[in-house]
């Protein structure tokens, strides 16, 4: 069905994500393999049909490209040998980032039907706060990823913005309207507002220190923490915020990264 197609697209781009260095790309699993009945028995014997083959066509680095991935046995690995253009593209991106080239990195992310509010906990590695641009690819093809990584990062952004403003006040500098963290916060808010505000009235998500959580504003209902909102609104905010967060991480040099970043976003059942 539709989910199988999206899962296949995620596997198709798995080697690209893997080759960027910090993230793991999607692979085939044994459960993806077709099973058929080969004979009539009381035990309902089923056999798996190998190889499982995925062929894809796409435009990689402005060139039309064909590639494929295969799984040949139950405990085998998903092949990568026929995905060299994607691997090379990912490696080239990694080199340019290290060389401080302001290359616009493409966004790719996948949000599956199983995405639930706070379902996926931050791993120890994520709690260490990856600062690399390439961290925008971490868990990007995990259909369960959504909100937790964004939450941790966004809290840091809001606190850093506040800290810089306090430092400026202590220096008797009254011009505290904007700093680099203000720009990032506003770009995230604009992205979420663009999708969520018109339909729900909720807008301007920000971390409030006194509440110790991220809150949203509404002209009718006032200010509530995201955890107090309905599941539907929370999940929509989480999805849009995660996309915007990845865009900002990948392309911090862009003035409005969520709007200017090209790429592919897979959403199963909006």
Regions found by a protein language model. Name each.
Residues 3, 264-265:
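Hydrophobic "anchor" residues on beta-strands that sit immediately upstream
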Residues 268-270:
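Walker B catalytic acidic pair
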């Amino acid at each position: 069905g539709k989910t199988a197609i999206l899962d296949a697209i995620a596997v198709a781009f798995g080697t690209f994500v893997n080759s960027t260095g910090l993230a793991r790309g999607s692979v085939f699993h044994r459960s993806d393999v077709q099973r058929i009945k080969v004979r009539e028995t009381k035990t309902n014997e089923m056999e798996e049909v190998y190889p499982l083959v995925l062929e894809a066509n796409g435009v990689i680095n402005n060139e039309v490209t064909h590639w494929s991935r295969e799984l040949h046995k139950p405990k085998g690995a998903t092949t990568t040998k026929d995905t060299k253009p994607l691997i090379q593209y990912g490696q080239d991106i990694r080199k340019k980032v290290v060389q401080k080239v302001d290359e616009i990195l493409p966004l790719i992310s996948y949000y599956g039907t199983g995405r639930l509010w706070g379902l996926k906990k931050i791993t120890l590695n994520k709690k260490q706060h990856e600062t690399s641009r390439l961290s925008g690819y971490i868990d990007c093809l995990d259909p369960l990823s959504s909100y937790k990584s964004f939450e941790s990062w966004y809290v840091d952004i809001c606190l850093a913005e506040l800290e810089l403003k306090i430092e400026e006040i202590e220096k008797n500098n009254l011009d505290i309207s904007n700093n680099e963290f203000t720009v990032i916060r506003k770009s995230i808010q604009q992205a979420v507002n663009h999708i969520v505000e018109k339909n729900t009235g909720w807008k301007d998500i920000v971390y409030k220190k006194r509440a110790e959580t991220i809150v949203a504003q509404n002209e009718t209902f006032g200010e509530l923490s995201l955890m107090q909102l309905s599941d539907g609104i929370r999940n929509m905010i989480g999805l849009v915020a995660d996309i915007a967060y990845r865009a900002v991480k990948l392309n911090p040099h862009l003035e409005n990264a969520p709007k200017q970043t090209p790429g592919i976003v897979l959403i199963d059942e909006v």
